[in-house]
C-alpha cells in the first residue's frame, strides 16, 4: 500500500518508489501494487504509481469502495494482458463473480462523469475529518506526550501513546464517549 496505507496513513516517498521499481525490474520480481486509498489525497496527488514505472511487470489494484460506496465491494486491476486469464481464474475461484448490478452502477457513474465530480467532494470531506481528528488529538492527547502521524491523504491516523498509557484500558472509555479505535 504505497498511498496512505492502513494503519499508519503514511505514503511511500518518491525515492522509495523508484528504488522498489528499479529492484523489481532488475530482479524480475513482479510488483503487486494495492492502492485502495490512492485517490484520497488532500492537497497534492501522490507520486506516480509503482506500476506505471514497469507496466509489464506489475499489477495495479484499485477500489471503488473507498471513493464511491463501501457496500459495492468493487475494485479493478491493471495488468499485462498476458496475465488476464490467470487473474480471471483466481477471481472466479475466490467468489465466482461480482454482482452485475454493482458493476453496472459503477460503469454508469464513470460514464456520466459523476465519479469525476464526486471524488473531489470525498477528498474534501476526508480532509475535514482528518483536520478535526488532528485538532482533537492535539487538544486531548497533546499534553500526554502522545505522537501521531499527519496524513496527507486516506483515512488513517497512527497514534503512539506514551508507555504509561495502555491502549487496551483506554478503549472502553473511548467507546463510552462515543468513539472507537483499534488498539
Please report, for each region that a protein language model flagged, where it lies by residue.
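PLP-dependent class I/II
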Residues: 1-183
Amino acid at each position: 500500500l504505497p498511498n496512505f496505507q492502513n494503519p499508519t496513513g503514511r505514503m511511500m516517498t518518491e525515492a522509495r518508489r523508484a528504488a522498489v521499481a528499479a529492484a523489481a525490474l532488475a530482479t524480475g520480481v513482479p510488483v503487486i501494487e494495492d492502492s485502495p486509498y490512492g485517490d484520497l489525497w488532500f492537497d497534492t496527488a501522490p507520486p506516480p504509481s509503482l506500476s506505471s514505472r514497469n507496466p509489464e511487470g506489475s499489477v495495479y489494484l484499485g477500489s471503488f469502495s473507498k471513493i464511491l460506496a463501501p457496500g459495492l465491494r468493487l475494485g479493478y486491476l491493471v495488468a499485462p494482458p498476458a496475465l488476464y486469464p490467470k487473474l480471471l481464474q483466481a477471481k472466479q475461484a475466490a467468489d465466482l463473480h461480482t454482482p452485475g448490478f454493482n458493476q453496472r452502477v459503477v460503469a454508469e457513474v464513470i460514464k456520466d462523469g459523476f465519479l469525476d465530480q464526486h471524488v473531489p467532494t470525498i477528498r474534501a470531506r476526508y480532509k475535514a475529518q482528518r483536520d478535526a481528528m488532528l485538532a482533537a488529538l492535539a487538544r486531548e492527547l497533546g499534553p500526554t506526550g502522545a505522537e501521531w502521524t499527519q496524513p496527507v491523504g486516506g483515512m488513517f491516523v497512527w497514534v503512539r501513546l506514551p508507555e504509561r498509557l495502555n491502549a487496551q484500558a483506554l478503549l472502553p472509555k473511548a467507546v463510552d464517549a462515543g468513539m472507537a479505535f483499534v488498539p
